[in-house]
Amino acid sequence: ALTDLATHNTRVCNAAATAIAWGVAQAMRGEENLDKIVDATIEAAAEGAKYGFSIPSPDIGMRIALACDIVRKAKDDQQALHDLYAMFGGGDLSADSIPSAIALFLLGKGDVKKTLEYCVNFGGDCDTNGAMAGAMVGAMAGIDAVPQVWRDKISEMNACNFSKDADEILALIPQWHVASESDVADLIK
């Protein structure tokens, strides 16, 4: 998540980027418990918020918790979607999009197709929400959980190779580590 420092070096942006990056990392490392992944995103947001310039902004971790509580308390998926949209809308501010994407990930219950359909139909900045929630659920469920027709269409339209890209990312896992204070200090000098 330190990659956002070059262009978005604010506490709120660092919290947002760290939450999504750590959620994806937890899923890639094999965590299958959705609540544990959500909790990890909240903890990561708090850690990321320690770095960058302070600007007036909401607390990303608190908003993730609120969004996920909306999903957990809803009587069904449609109520969850309605209430989530009523609270956060489909906007592109990280204070809205990050909590929404993580809540949509939770609502999809590990089902890639359902999660992405919820994101697309949520409205607003649906491609960004789909990319974030899709990265988390895709990392958890694996490439085979993404319908082949979707992979083919995305590869055709965007000249990308999911399998090659995934293999390259997976090869990096042994090199991952949690950034230390000195790592961050070196980057922002």
Regions found by a protein language model. Name each.
Residues 183-189:
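Bulky hydrophobic segments
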Residues 1-12, 18-26, 96, 100-182:
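Catalytic phosphate/nucleotide-handling subdomain of diverse soluble enzymes
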Residues 36, 40, 59-62, 66, ...:
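Exposed alpha-helical structural elements
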Residues 24-123:
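Accessory "access/gating" subregions that flank catalytic or transport cores
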